[in-house]
Amino acid sequence: MAERGYSFSLTTFSPSGKLVQIEYALAAVAAGAPSVGIKATNGVVLATEKKQKSILYDEQSAHKVEPITKHIGMVYSGMGPDYRVLVRRARKLAQQYYLVYQEPIPTAQLVQRVASVMQEYTQSGGVRPFGVSLLIAGWDEGRPYLFQSDPSGAYFAWKATAMGKNYVNGKTFLEKRYNEDLELEDAIHTAILTLKESFEGQMTEDNIEVGICNEAGFKRLTPAEVKDYLAAIA
């Protein structure tokens, strides 16, 4: 009860030392569609559940797995409109870096800059935190990278992780299945199986999205490619 008076103020700490609006933003992430990221020896895979709104909906009109540069891509759990703002901001930050240094932005640099944007929205008046967590995959300096960034602006490097609805089940499954020698092909299968752990209904190429990042760059798999992977694990 004592914290209720602080729940609408973003810039005021509650007596227990929390910024309650950030707690609410994390709750929005935990209620969002599940997403999974796995770093393999030769690449990174991102996978997410894509809810079908209606049979009349054009599935290709909006994507959850988005490329930021040729070698970096990301996915989210949480609020879609907030994510699209961050996608645009991330692309702009990457372009600004290229204009200054004449080389592609390293993955860790982009994560740091996007996380700084998210952190700004936790201490400014008249705004609210972003209701999304991001998984950012990249390839540079001959190796893969996987990061997660939260509404608070905190970011961490991961070998494999899950977020969104039932993320605890996803992480438990990954802890059992993950090993350091995982190849990209196996990682794709593992990511889909992780999503399947908490998936409701029939999993098809229309209601999941998969992106991969390796030496060749980042790409979103086509529905036909996803269908082949689903057939392989059936």
Curated annotation (Swiss-Prot):
Cellular component, GO, one term: proteasome core complex, alpha-subunit complex
CDD domains: proteasome_alpha_type_2
Subcellular location: Cytoplasm; Nucleus
Entries under SMART domains matching the protein: Proteasome_A_N (SM00948)
Keyword Acetylation: yes
Sequence positions bearing N-acetylalanine: 2
Single Gene Ontology BP annotation: proteasome-mediated ubiquitin-dependent protein catabolic process
Phosphotyrosine: residues carrying this PTM: 121
UniProt keyword Phosphoprotein present: yes
UniProt superkingdom: Eukaryota
Pfam annotation, one family: Proteasome
Disulphide-bonded residues: none
Keywords annotated in UniProt: Acetylation, Cytoplasm, Nucleus, Phosphoprotein, Proteasome
Family according to the record: Belongs to the peptidase T1A family.
Subunit description: The 26S proteasome consists of a 20S proteasome core and two 19S regulatory subunits. The 20S proteasome core is a barrel-shaped complex made of 28 subunits that are arranged in four stacked rings. The two outer rings are each formed by seven alpha subunits, and the two inner rings are formed by seven beta subunits. The proteolytic activity is exerted by three beta-subunits PSMB5, PSMB6 and PSMB7.
Function: Component of the 20S core proteasome complex involved in the proteolytic degradation of most intracellular proteins. This complex plays numerous essential roles within the cell by associating with different regulatory particles. Associated with two 19S regulatory particles, forms the 26S proteasome and thus participates in the ATP-dependent degradation of ubiquitinated proteins.
Name of the molecule in the record: Proteasome subunit alpha type-2
